[in-house]
Each structure stands twice: as C-alpha cells, then as structure tokens.
Amino acid sequence: MDTEVYSNTGGQMSKSTPIGAITKFAYSGRGIGKKDLGAIAMSYGHVYVAQISLGANMPQTIKAFREADSYDGPSLIIAYSHCIAHGINMSKGLEQGKAVVDCGLWPLYRYDPRLKAQGKNPFQLDSRDPTTSIEDYMYKEVRFKSLKAASPDRADALLAKAKTQVERTWKEYKYLAERPF
C-alpha cells in the first residue's frame, strides 16, 4: 500500500511523496520526484512487479494479484492507497485512485518475468494515455491545494516539474511496453 507518506507515524514526507505535496518535513512542498520502486524491482529481472489502483481498474488489480500469487519467485504489488494525510474526504478514496491514474501520475502496469521465456515482452502497460490534467487530481487534495494557497509561484513551478515528470515517465513506460522482445 503506497500512501505516498509515512502514514503510520503522522504523515511525514517519504521517498514516495510526490512533487508539490506538503507533508511534515516538506512544508514548502516536496521539490523532487518520488522514487520509482517498481522500476527498481523490475531492474532485477526476476521479480514479478505490478502497480495497481483498485479505484481505477479492478480487473487489472485482480489479474495482478493472481499473477503474483502464481509466480514462483519474489512478487511486489504497489497499490495506490488514499490516506487521511492527503486531506480528502475518505469516502472519495476510490475516485482519487482513478483520478491519479487518469492524469498519468500513477501508471498501471505488470511486469511478469515468465513472459521472457516465451519470447514475449515482460512489461505490460495497462493504463491508457493520460486523459485529464494533473491539476484535476492534485487540487482535490489539501496536501497540494494548501501549497497553491500559501505560495502560488512555488506551486506553479512544482506543478510544471510534475508535468515534465509525467511526460518522461510515460515515454519510458511506453518504450518498455512497445519494444521488440
């Protein structure tokens, strides 16, 4: 479960905190991108990895759990999870889980090393290209809205960085999904 903060100790910034989010220890908004845990795990080549969001795509979530369970080796499922530290109505969590995928900040994918033995690409990108703006997602959450209210120039600069990061990540993931294997 990735809440993008240290939820169990009060919502402090972690290496999973996205650009522009205000948290404890990042009061002016996190200025750098989050660590891509999935890419790190995929780099080993023998780890099953999936990134999921139940609110965005339940069939993909179920498929990832089934594949991970059947894989004879280490498996890692990174699941988007809303958190009280995000500053949203908790009944809207699944909607935010869809919004984060729709804007491209949380691509859904599966990496199954077994496919390599079949001559197939092990990386499957399960998300469509982003269909909404990052602002549509971010400014529904207090952790982003409060920076916009307190420091609009900084918020705008970090939003631009977040957009650049999404574009770069999408190019990289699309390359991984489309490359010949």
PLM features: residue spans?
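Thiamine diphosphate
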Residues: 1-76, 82-84, 88-103, 146, ...
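Generic preference for well-ordered secondary structure
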Residues: 21, 25, 33, 48-49, ...
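A short, terminal or domain-edge coil/loop segment
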Residues: 26, 53-55, 131, 135, ...
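Glycine/aspartate-rich loop-and-adjacent alpha/beta segment that forms the canonical ThDP
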Residues: 58-154, 161, 174-176
